[in-house]
């Protein structure tokens, strides 16, 4: 269809061009002059009518005083920024616009050549007639860039200089003002009574154009049109590409008269949406074009048409001459040129609408100036033409206004596109290519500012005369209007018109403040940024009522109200959406706060749990520590108990033995009646006369009796001698006694030769027996110095080798009651008892050869006096005469024998002599500070000579023990310990007695009355069948005598004294009941008793180490060698 239209247009154009050539022939010279006047705007290919058009335009413009001057001079009123720039001074008269555009259109097309690439039909809603007219009026590229607003921008990159060929043709014919005048006359002649529009409707398909112009235009238009039809297919709406001006006119007529659907109108509406745009865009020219086309087509055959033209343009040869003819022409032209220059200098931005109006109104204000510019002979003709034109223009302007309103509606609908909202006007038009789109995100428009796209109203206003149409469009322009303010900044010309037009709608869509400057959506009711979502599309979709409306129909009030309501609803929904978003945000914030709180609580719970766990762990550790400590304490306690048990074990063992190891001890007689228990005692501690002894006290003797030592009370220091664990430990006992004593006691060596020993040990004859024995049992180094001994300053260990070879002792257990009084003497009341106690001695304790060396020196012819030897320690080999049968048969220890029994055994007189001598020696040894006490009491004072004894440990625990050879000499039987202080020639043995270490505690022993021999005394039940191996006797510590000094009060009690022989104080290192002292004689001759009986028991006081005898006994001179057992034997003492 487009092709048919193109062909028809070409044919009609050829016809028109032919008629135009005829007309042009008449005006050759005038056209040449007009061409010269046109300058660059006219092309040589353009025909005469174009030149006539320009000349006529100028002439008419000069004559018109009603703002109908073509905007060529001043561009009319500048459109502001809406039409691209003030370069196009636009006048309201579409006729003049059409004339100017018609004059320039073909020439511009020719100048562009094939460069014009956009067919008019394919430029939807982008060609306002005023724009194209003004664009055509401008020179050079101004005409090329005069394409309507957004369309020119949309296609500006590809086709920067595109004239509007369609409107150019229309404008060409419309610009021939003389044709209109001739048109009426020609119409009257050919078709009388038919008016321009009617003629156009009658001949809608006749495409009128001047012959020379049509070929050029058609050629230049068709080729680019075909080229550009494809690019514009997708983005832009397609309208029938027929470039002829007739189809728009036909469209307009058809749209106005829908009862006469013409092919052109149908073709114009092939594309529903672009067709209204195209028609509306071209409608402004269609009345003019129609009439002018009719005039062009109808009048060319008639010659009179050329005559008015020749008459019209006869005197006008150039613009220069026009200026010279017009008195104010220079001023007017200057004003117009100034506005054009300003618009050109503004970079394509035209001046504001006020400037446009001002340019056209200046002419109106000057008034009458046009007459001065016209020749006098043409005044009447021009006036007639003006009247005709005015009448025609009035009709055209009214039609144009209506069309402009519709066009404006369509354009404004495109000017505010939304991505998802398709206005019913152009459903196929993509949003990016709307002609009046304000914010096109895709395309840039270098030639025009965005504000230039917003002035459809200014186009319509300027396309019609200001004064004659009843518009109250503008005021008299002031100087401030020359500032060329932008469209959006000044809207003073947007006042309502007296006639209803589309401006009211324009004011509705475009408030006073610029859409360009104001953010979209603030002043515009539509969402220009496409912020509406799909949910709002139903509310913002105007297609239902817009598409149902014909393209040329006006928007009704109801539709506007619906639009407003939809927009309000949209904003309401938008508000609700925002509120929902805020609610969601608050909810999310609350959830986040709750999550944070929960996390905080969880963290706090974890921390609390960790602290609690740590506390539990700490408690557990503390409990484990306490438990471990408790276990450790229990272990220590267990160890202590085990240690104590081990310490007590030997005690128990010794208690279980009938006779334990020989331990020295003194038993204090604490009871008036001597009761000797049969239990075994392993150790005896001394008891004081004033307090009952604590036999289980194992504290060290030094600490228990610390600070209590004194000269008079030194016997209790014997306790210190026995505080040695070695006495209770079998290991130590074995170490001490399990072999050679030399190994256990390195300081002890047995005497090899008694005679040699006498010589070497002279001056150290005696050693305290208790010291030697304790040293013997306590590893030989317990008492290197006796701090409690006031008289002994040397260690007794040095004198240990001088111990008597034979020392015997026994223990008598006594009960604890009766402290301080000696118990009743255990006596042999009959010979049978005595014989039973000594029957085992028949076997002999030592072999005979052990005493052969001493036989010649020791009491020749007399038996060895053993007054206190144990039952099994008989010495049958000492003397050819065996001991008396009574003593042999008595099972009691000889230390318990009474004087009567001992008296029977002692028969030699020299023993008495020795006894007396020793008595004298002892008397001399009394301590000076104790002499008064001896005189008052008549007691012998001395360190108790507890003679060393030799008990065969092999019978119990001591495996190897050598028999001790007893020294025999002519000296006395014993030597007082005082002889230690000085060398004594009277003491050939120098070891007869051992001094008891000084003690801090005195034991008072009451010697009970002696019993008659016939009385039955306590029988000592001790095994006598045990054999004691013989061996050398070892002196434990030879240096003992050096550290010990014998007390001068020490005395030797005679064995025959019944009270003393049976009463003695027993000392033992372990808790024991009190034991009676055991008298031990070392080869002491037992003298016959001077007094067989002692009438009363005398109290016996043990001094530091002595037994105090009664004066009566001292007078008798009977002395008895008393032996203190340092360790209590497990002797079962029979009472």
From Swiss-Prot:
Region Disordered, residue ranges: 1-115, 156-308, 339-405, 447-484, 736-764, 921-948, 1007-1135
Gly residues bias: start-end ranges: 73-83
Protein name: APC membrane recruitment protein 1
Primary location recorded for the protein, binned into one broad class: cytoplasm
Biased composition (Acidic residues): 373-405, 926-938
UniProt GO MF annotations: beta-catenin binding; beta-catenin destruction complex binding; phosphatidylinositol-4,5-bisphosphate binding
Protein's job: Regulator of the canonical Wnt signaling pathway. Acts by specifically binding phosphatidylinositol 4,5-bisphosphate (PtdIns(4,5)P2), translocating to the cell membrane and interacting with key regulators of the canonical Wnt signaling pathway, such as components of the beta-catenin destruction complex. Acts both as a positive and negative regulator of the Wnt signaling pathway, depending on the context: acts as a positive regulator by promoting LRP6 phosphorylation.
Membrane topology: Peripheral membrane protein
């Amino acid at each position: 269809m487009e092709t048919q239209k193109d062909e028809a247009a070409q044919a009609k154009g050829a016809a028109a061009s032919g008629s135009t050539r005829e007309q042009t022939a008449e005006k050759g010279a005038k056209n040449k002059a007009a061409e010269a006047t046109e300058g660059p705007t006219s092309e040589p290919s353009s025909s005469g009518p174009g030149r006539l058009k320009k000349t006529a335009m100028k002439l008419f413009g000069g004559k018109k005083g009603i703002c109908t001057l073509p905007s060529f001079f001043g561009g009319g009123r500048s459109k502001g920024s809406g039409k691209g720039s003030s370069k196009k001074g636009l006048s309201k008269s579409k006729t003049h616009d059409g004339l100017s555009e018609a004059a320039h259109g073909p020439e511009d097309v020719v100048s562009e050549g094939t460069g014009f690439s956009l067919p008019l039909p394919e430029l939807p809603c982008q060609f306002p007639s005023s724009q194209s007219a003004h664009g055509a009026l401008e020179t050079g590229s101004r005409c090329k860039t005069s394409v309507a607003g957004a369309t020119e921008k949309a296609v500006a990159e590809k086709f920067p200089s595109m004239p509007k060929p369609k409107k150019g043709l229309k404008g060409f014919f419309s610009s021939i003002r003389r044709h209109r005048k001739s048109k009426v006359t020609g119409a009257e002649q050919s078709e009388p009574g038919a008016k321009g529009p009617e003629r156009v409707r009658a001949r809608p398909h006749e495409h009128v154009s001047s012959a020379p112009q049509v070929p050029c235009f058609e050629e230049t238009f068709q080729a680019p049109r075909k080229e550009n039809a494809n690019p514009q297919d997708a983005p832009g709406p397609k309208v029938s590409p027929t470039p002829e001006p007739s189809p728009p006119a036909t469209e307009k007529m058809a749209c106005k008269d829908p009862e006469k659907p013409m092919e052109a109108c149908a073709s114009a509406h092939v594309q529903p949406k672009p067709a209204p745009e195209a028609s509306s865009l071209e409608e402004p020219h269609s009345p003019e074009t129609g009439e002018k086309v009719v005039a062009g087509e109808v009048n060319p055959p008639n010659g009179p048409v050329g005559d008015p033209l020749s008459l019209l343009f006869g005197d006008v040869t150039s613009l220069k001459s026009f200026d010279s003819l017009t008195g104010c022409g220079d001023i007017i032209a200057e004003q117009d040129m100034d506005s054009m220059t300003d618009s050109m200098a503004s970079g394509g931005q035209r001046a504001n609408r006020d400037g446009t109006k001002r340019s056209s109104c200046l002419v109106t204000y000057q008034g009458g100036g046009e007459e001065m510019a016209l020749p006098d002979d043409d005044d009447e003709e021009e006036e007639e033409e003006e009247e005709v034109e005015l009448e025609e223009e009035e009709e055209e302007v009214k039609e144009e206004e209506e069309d402009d309103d519709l066009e404006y509606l369509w354009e404004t609908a495109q000017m505010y596109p939304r991505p998802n909202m398709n206005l019913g006007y152009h459903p196929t038009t993509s949003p990016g290519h709307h002609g009046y789109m304000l914010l096109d995100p895709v395309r840039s428009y270098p030639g025009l500012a965005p504000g230039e796209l917003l002035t459809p109203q200014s186009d319509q206003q300027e396309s019609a005369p200001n004064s004659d149409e009843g518009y109250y469009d503008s005021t008299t322009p002031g100087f401030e209007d020359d500032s060329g303010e932008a469209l959006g900044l000044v809207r003073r010309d947007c006042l309502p018109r007296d006639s209803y037009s589309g401006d009211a709608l324009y004011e509705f869509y475009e408030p006073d403040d610029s859409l360009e400057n104001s953010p979209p959506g603030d002043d515009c009711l539509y969402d220009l940024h496409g912020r509406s979502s799909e949910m709002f599309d139903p509310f913002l979709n105007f297609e239902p009522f817009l598409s149902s409306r014909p393209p040329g129909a006006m928007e009704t009030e109801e539709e506007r109200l619906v639009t407003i309501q939809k927009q309000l609803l949209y904003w309401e929904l938008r508000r609700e959406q925002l509120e929902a978003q805020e609610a969601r945000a608050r909810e999310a914030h609350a959830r986040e706060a709750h999550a944070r709180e929960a996390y905080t609580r969880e963290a706090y719970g974890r921390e609390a749990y960790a602290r609690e766990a740590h506390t539990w762990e700490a408690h557990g550790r503390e409990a484990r520590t306490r438990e471990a400590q408790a276990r450790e304490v229990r272990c220590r306690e267990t160890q202590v108990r085990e240690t104590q048990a081990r310490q007590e074990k030997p005690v128990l063992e010794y208690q279980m033995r009938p006779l334990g190891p020989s331990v020295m001890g003194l038993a204090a007689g604490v009871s008036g009646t001597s009761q000797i228990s049969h239990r075994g005692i392993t150790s005896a501690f001394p008891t004081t006369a004033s307090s009952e002894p604590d036999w289980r006290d194992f504290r060290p003797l030094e600490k228990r009796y610390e600070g209590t030592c004194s000269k008079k009370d030194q016997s209790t220091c014997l306790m210190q001698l026995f505080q040695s664990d070695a006495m209770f430990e079998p290991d130590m006992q074995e170490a001490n006694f399990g072999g050679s004593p030399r190994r256990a006691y390195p300081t002890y060596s047995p005497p090899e030769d008694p005679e040699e020993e006498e010589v070497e040990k002279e001056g150290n004859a005696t050693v305290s027996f208790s010291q030697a024995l304790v040293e013997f049992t306590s590893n030989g180094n317990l008492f290197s110095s006796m701090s409690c001994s006031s008289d002994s300053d040397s260690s007794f260990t040095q004198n240990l080798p001088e111990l008597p070879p034979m020392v015997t002792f026994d223990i008598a257990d006594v009960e604890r009651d009766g402290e301080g009084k000696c118990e009743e003497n255990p006596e042999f009341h009959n010979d049978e008892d005595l014989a039973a106690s000594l029957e085992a001695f028949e076997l002999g304790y030592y072999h005979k050869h052990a005493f052969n060396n001493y036989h010649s020196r020791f009491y020749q012819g007399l038996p060895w006096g053993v007054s206190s030897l144990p039952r099994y320690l008989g010495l049958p080999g000492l003397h050819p005469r065996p001991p008396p049968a009574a003593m042999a048969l008595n099972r009691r220890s000889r230390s318990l024998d009474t004087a009567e029994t001992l008296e029977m055994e002692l028969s030699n007189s020299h023993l008495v002599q020795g006894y007396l001598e020793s008595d004298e020696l002892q008397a001399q040894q009394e301590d000076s500070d104790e002499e008064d006490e001896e005189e008052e009491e008549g007691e012998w004072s001395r360190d108790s000579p507890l003679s060393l004894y030799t008990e065969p440990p092999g019978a119990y625990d001591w495996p190897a023990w050598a028999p001790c050879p007893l020294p025999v000499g002519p000296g006395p039987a014993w030597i007082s310990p005082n002889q230690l202080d000085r060398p004594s020639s009277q003491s050939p043995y120098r070891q007869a007695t051992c001094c008891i270490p000084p003690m801090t505690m005195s034991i008072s022993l009451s010697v009970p009355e002696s019993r008659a021999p016939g009385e039955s005394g306590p029988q000592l039940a001790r095994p006598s069948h045990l054999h004691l191996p013989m061996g050398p006797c070892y002196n434990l510590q030879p240096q003992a005598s050096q550290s010990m000094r014998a007390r001068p009060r020490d005395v030797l009690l005679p064995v025959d004294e019944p009270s003393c022989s049976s009463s003695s104080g027993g000392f033992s290192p372990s808790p024991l009941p009190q034991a009676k002292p055991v008298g031990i004689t070392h080869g002491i001759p037992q003298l016959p008793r001077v007094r067989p009986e002692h009438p009363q028991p005398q109290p016996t006081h043990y001094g530091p180490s002595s037994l105090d005898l009664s004066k009566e006994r001292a007078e008798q001179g009977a002395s008895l060698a008393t032996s203190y057992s340092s360790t209590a034997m497990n002797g079962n003492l029979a009472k």
